[in-house]
Amino acid sequence: MSHIRKEKQKMKVIYPDYLKQFQCSGKECPDTCCKGWGIQIDARTWKKYQEEKGSFGKQIRKNSNKRDRTLKFQEGVCNFLTKEGLCRLQQAKGAEFLCKTCREYPRHLEIYGEQKEWSLSLSCPEVAKLILTRERPIAWLAIEKDVESNYKGEVEEELVELYYKMREWLVEVIQEPTKPIAIKVAEAMALAHDFQKYQKKERKENWEEVEERIQSVWNRYQKENETGRLETKLKKFQGETELKNIYVGNYLKIFHEMEAIEEEFLKFVRQVEGNMGENKETIGKERRLIKDAKEQSAKREVFYQNLFLYFLSVYFVGGIYDGMLYTKVKLAVFSFLIIRELIEQKELKEGRWLREEETWKIAWQYARQIEHSSYNLERLEEELESKEAFSLEMMLYCVLA
């Protein structure tokens, strides 16, 4: 990465319209954000911790790793977490004394060229509840700020704008109100597959030509959608339950190779692997016996739409740095498939619809397992990028089964 002298410049700051609705539930939280990941201390906070005087300063340094500037954990839990689930650092010195990660979580900042984008992490139980129950379409707000930045010129502005435009189109596909979520996920995946053909990181082309090609893909999608041709194309992938069971069963094996972040979640995944012989028809028969099945189905459509939108919106624009926009969408599809399968298999086994908070828990535990380990996230993206098991055709069979 090139180092450029910091200078004041106008920077657009983008955030989802629900960002400021988040409020930490504190003691009422069903879990804690102070376990299961390595919390690295930023340079400014590390210096402050090293200079802290008295017995409290000694306590901080005793519970910090000097080599990699991280907080020490015991059995996966931060040493500064109290029995009441509160942070001793914050209790003693206030929120401003915390390191950048602890101070901002579950808020997360990404920088795309000369733009900043804030999001909320699904790995937080309160965020999961906020995002997954949302009934209104997602919208992004933007403000301009004068900030110091050393990112000027690192990414072409045209590329960033193109990615935001493609994300806008994909979000439009997912938020179409009349189609089932599985159909919309399949359409978004096919659309991203075609976008990828015309956007390669290593190709230096006239931006107008690239934009025209991407626009032509979107225009073709709209035309095929209006004429019903798109629906016809997808029909051959529908109802293949046996194929879905084989493919998704294999997808679950990826978790065997991951760093363990959420032990309870990984144990649940292993249990589900043993139930993959059950088919979709059986699940359907079980559900028809449940009194409020129609109402529950409508709620679940909202849940899955919000789930997919989360992974799409958080990761897609990051493709400006590696050119892997299609892989970013496949990550959202993979997350949709795994969480849907885990929920359905648990419902099949127990013969009931899961309560909302149970589905939220599966989602935020999955997010922790993936997002709280850079190794796990990078490994998953490598698999999605390179393995035939994650081809467009195979994943469409899984989505539409």
Where are these regions (language model features)?
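Internal, well-ordered alpha/beta segment that forms a basic, Gly-enriched binding/recognition surface
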Residues: G85, K93-D194
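Short, charged/polar micro-motifs that form catalytic or ligand-binding hotspots
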Residues: C24, A92, E156, V160, ...
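Membrane helical hairpin/interfacial module
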Residues: W37-E84
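Short, compositionally biased low-complexity segments
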Residues: Q21-E28, P137-A142, E240-K244
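Hydrophobic, aromatic-lined core segments that form the binding pocket/scaffold
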Residues: P180-A401
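Local cysteine-cluster metal-coordination motifs and their immediate loop/turn environment
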Residues: Q21-I39, K72-H108, S121-A128
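Short linear interaction motifs
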Residues: I14-Y15, K83, I320-D322
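General N-terminal leader/first-domain-start detector
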Residues: M1-F56
